Curated annotation (Swiss-Prot):
Record's protein name: Holliday junction branch migration complex subunit RuvB
Organism: Acholeplasma laidlawii (strain PG-8A)
Gene: ruvB
Annotated family: Belongs to the RuvB family.
Documented EC number(s): 3.6.4.-
Quaternary assembly: Homohexamer. Forms an RuvA(8)-RuvB(12)-Holliday junction (HJ) complex. HJ DNA is sandwiched between 2 RuvA tetramers; dsDNA enters through RuvA and exits via RuvB. An RuvB hexamer assembles on each DNA strand where it exits the tetramer. Each RuvB hexamer is contacted by two RuvA subunits (via domain III) on 2 adjacent RuvB subunits; this complex drives branch migration. In the full resolvosome a probable DNA-RuvA(4)-RuvB(12)-RuvC(2) complex forms which resolves the HJ.
Localization of this protein: Cytoplasm
Predominant subcellular localization, coarse grouping: cytoplasm
Keywords of the record: ATP-binding, Cytoplasm, DNA damage, DNA recombination, DNA repair, DNA-binding, Hydrolase, Nucleotide-binding
Source organism superkingdom: Bacteria
Catalytic activity: ATP + H2O = ADP + phosphate + H(+)
Amino acid sequence: MSEEKSVLRDLNLKNDDELMLRPQTLNQYIGQDDIKEMLSIYIQAALKREESLDHVLLYGAPGLGKTTLAQIIANELGVDIKITSGPAIEKTGDLVALLSSLSPGDVLFIDEIHRIPRFVEEVLYSAMEDYTLDIVLDKERDSRSIRIELPPFTLIGATTRFGDLSHPLRERFGAVFRLSYYKLEEIKQIVRRTSKVYQNEIDEKAVDELSKRSRGTPRIANRLFRRVRDFAEIMTDAVITLDITQLALTKLGIDHKGLDASDYLYLRGIVERFNGGPVGLESLASTIGEEPGTIEDVYEPYLLQEGYIKRTPRGRVATELAYNLLGVKYYKGLLDN
């Protein structure tokens, strides 16, 4: 994977800089206003009753702030948070160890919760409902079960694939929130905040340009800011101007719509190889040399949001907007194929 591509694609990587940029309270968190309002009410009510917060499920595209919100919830509750991910929980013992280590009121955050093995997931059910663990011990022909009492805790799950969660697991979350792409003005606020954290001056036209190319995603906005800052520090007096921003983003291969070479490869695959579609996910993935899961989680959410593609029962279809972007003549009725 190239350096340019990684700015937009490696959305699950986190580093110390990104941790430094994270807001610590709901008041500091920019965007997702409806979610913040509801969380504030739920948190205040839980604190007033001196109870643990109901379990929370956060879902949406990568980079929209699910992990940050989980940490903020713990901060607002004044409790500790333990962070893990679905792939790290391979067996029942892994989950039991995590749950047994919690103190009363603590938050357990599981990223990519849809990737927990189903047999492990089932152990969560009683833990979430009754704060108990029922463990079956097998000893040759005899088996017995033991019950472990757990302290009250809050489970926060995050996923990019809401539909992959089992119905029993979804039903055990008391609050479910879908994070949306951020509005342009919200991304601008995030860019201005980032410039203050890094103590880099940026002019307003540069803020606007960088924000427009950030795909409505805070993590991308912050990463693009750091790359543009590099150009500014080497080529000017470190002030981030419109010219420097345009130069840096062009070098990174990101166009004025926030699309990169991989997006164009995807769209050309549908339009040129499959006559605009419909095309199945596996066929498309094979054509462009990408994993199906990456296409679903990273490529498609933004292209769907912006109207370049549609998902139909028969597969992916390129829209007239995609044809116009690629400079290919569009014929009415293609979407009805």
